[in-house]
Amino acid sequence: MQFGADTEFSNMCGVTLMNTPIGRVVADVMGAKDGVELTEYPSMIRVDGVNRLDFDYDELTDALGQDFDGSIFEEISSTHYGRMVHLDDKTILFASPEDAAEFIGFDLTAS
């Protein structure tokens, strides 16, 4: 991914995870998915995805061998871009605000 001042819609979303044992496993699970790119730094791991990223807590619990939920996601993540939706069983990042609004049933049209 290149940084710059391009004003066109990128159709990308992403999050920065702490490079800890838990963050590493989460990054590895996400990096195995189609359309997901990992960029590693000494203290953090960027997870960038095309259109949408789904952090499924059951999938991550299985990979970690211990419970994973929204509080742990919040603990290991810092910055993000895209629209974030937290559910009981997953966190979803959407590249498009319209897609996120449709997913949660929010009407973006002015009345």
From Swiss-Prot:
- Subunit note: The propane 2-monooxygenase multicomponent enzyme system is composed of an electron transfer component and a monooxygenase component interacting with the effector protein PrmD. The electron transfer component is composed of a reductase (PrmB), and the monooxygenase component is formed by a large subunit (PrmA) and a small subunit (PrmC).
Q: What does this protein do?
A: Effector component of the propane 2-monooxygenase multicomponent enzyme system which is involved in the degradation of propane via the O2-dependent hydroxylation of propane.
Annotated family = Belongs to the TmoD/XamoD family.
What does the entry say induces or represses the expression of this protein?
By propane and acetone.
GO MF assignments: monooxygenase activity
Report what the protein is called.
Propane 2-monooxygenase, effector component
Q: Which Gene3D superfamilies match?
A: Monooxygenase component MmoB/DmpM
